[in-house]
Amino acid sequence: MPSSRTCVGVVFGGASEEHAVSIRSAITVVGALRSEVNNNRFEVIAIYIDQRGRWWPAGVAEAVLKQGHPAKPEQLSTPLAPQGFTKLPEGSERVQVWYPVLHGPNGEDGTVQGLFTLMGQPFVGSGVLGSALSMDKLAMKAAFAAAGLPQVPYAAVDAADLLETESRQGVAKHLEAKLKYPCFVKPANLGSSVGISKAQNRNELLIGLDKAASLDRRIVVEQGVSARELECAVLGKRELQTSVVGEICFDADWYDYDTKYSENCSHTLIPAPLPEGVEAQIRTLALQACRCVAAHGMARVDFFYNAARNEIWLNEINTLPGFTSQSMYPMLWEASGVTLEELVSQLVITARE
């Protein structure tokens, strides 16, 4: 007799700098799907992608989830498959809905979404276009600019222009003419604050550019602003819904990778204490930003807010936001009356619409 439960394929890990974060997120997601509330609704098949892009079946995936860190060489069968995707692991034929819990390139950028689309199977999150546009900060910012959405001044840099001394200095002069210090240098296609540097002068700017160029050929440099960091969660496909707005507070100079994923380095205020009308503005902008880049399913939209100037700037969209114990997306929905168990259930249901 066929099972009445929906079989969900949770894919995590990935050939990305954010591999470890993906594992932490997957532990939360799988736990919520297998909770007492959801046990009669879903069957979970976990699939692990190692750091070379090879896909592994449930046996390996469950071991990684249990240990909470990447698979060790002895846990992987030999001889190893070639690098990258070759075929779906055993058991995948039973999957009815795919749930990618992947962060960064090769997972959040439209690549895996394209695979699921070719397979003709539903999946959680945005499609190819929304994922790709939202992942690439330069493409995303160009879309925001075309729609007239507010954002801080920025400039684009091609890593090829940093190879020679003369061209490097030319890039620095161009950036200094367009932006003021401090500024932030970011690889265009990485998340979780990976590869981001703050520059207070030309020397730090060039060091930051080299760091970003080692990770991505496309680089974005943003004007630093004095602002609070706010976030709003979005859920839905045909009809997008927004959560309450939350604020990230931290003692560090800026919200870098260590601050984001270390215990006791930051705290959140949910809902954020905001003047009347500001939360409504942010929630409206979050919807506009998602529609602008064709993001749906789920997204976390990040903002800067300067209270003295009463100015709001869009920072970025994350179409596969983290689900770790410190991640804002599930916390924002919890504060909006949607439990973690209800949230993952709704995401799977939305994927089938």
Swiss-Prot record:
The UniProt record lists the EC number as 6.3.2.4
Summarizing the function annotation, the protein's role is: Cell wall formation.
User: Can you name this protein?
Assistant: D-alanine--D-alanine ligase
**Which Gene Ontology molecular-function terms are recorded?**
ATP binding; D-alanine-D-alanine ligase activity; metal ion binding
Q: Which residues bind Mg(2+) 1?
A: 302, 316
Q: Which ranges carry the ATP-grasp domain?
A: 141-349
Q: In which pathway does it act?
A: Cell wall biogenesis; peptidoglycan biosynthesis
Q: How is the cofactor bound?
A: Binds 2 magnesium or manganese ions per subunit.
NCBIfam families in the record, alphabetically?
D_ala_D_alaTIGR, PRK01966.1-4
What keywords sit in the KW lines?
A: ATP-binding, Cell shape, Cell wall biogenesis/degradation, Cytoplasm, Ligase, Magnesium, Manganese, Metal-binding, Nucleotide-binding, Peptidoglycan synthesis
